[in-house]
From Swiss-Prot:
HAMAP family: Ribosomal_uS11 (MF_01310). The gene is rpsK. PANTHER family: 40S RIBOSOMAL PROTEIN S14/30S RIBOSOMAL PROTEIN S11 (PTHR11759). Part of the 30S ribosomal subunit. Interacts with proteins S7 and S18. Binds to IF-3. GO terms for cellular component: ribonucleoprotein complex; ribosome. This is Small ribosomal subunit protein uS11. Belongs to the universal ribosomal protein uS11 family. Located on the platform of the 30S subunit, it bridges several disparate RNA helices of the 16S rRNA. Forms part of the Shine-Dalgarno cleft in the 70S ribosome. One of its GO terms (biological process) is translation. One of its GO terms (molecular function) is rRNA binding. It comes from Jannaschia sp. (strain CCS1). InterPro entries: Ribosomal_uS11, Ribosomal_uS11_bac-type, Ribosomal_uS11_CS, Ribosomal_uS11_sf. The keyword Glycoprotein does not apply. The lineage of its organism: Bacteria, Pseudomonadati, Pseudomonadota, Alphaproteobacteria, Rhodobacterales.
Amino acid sequence: MARDRRPAKKKVSKNIAAGVAHVNSSFNNTKILISDVQGNAIAWSSAGTMGFKGSRKSTPFAAQMAAEDAGKKAQDHGVRTLEVEVQGPGSGRESALRALAALGFQISSIRDVTPMAHNGCRPPKRRRV
């Protein structure tokens, strides 16, 4: 039996001038979240949501497409300047950053917030292929 669906809320166009782009680039995927300065999400995208599957998600091109998608959504909300926080060891870091710059955002700062262990947990064993 079909469930009753609530009417979808219309997305309110916020008018935010400055934001923070969080680029999370792992070995398997690249996620881009654009938030306001307080950390409330405005727009997000990832290589997986752009239709890439499997090992294609980890490519720089997939990261570029995801960054363009998130950037266009953020521009609809009025974001013009960005601080960029890059996290992770993936290959999509630079290409996502270049894609955001190419969209016309004024990038005020770039920070690498990759967590580094100060001799914490034991790492996983080396792969033998």
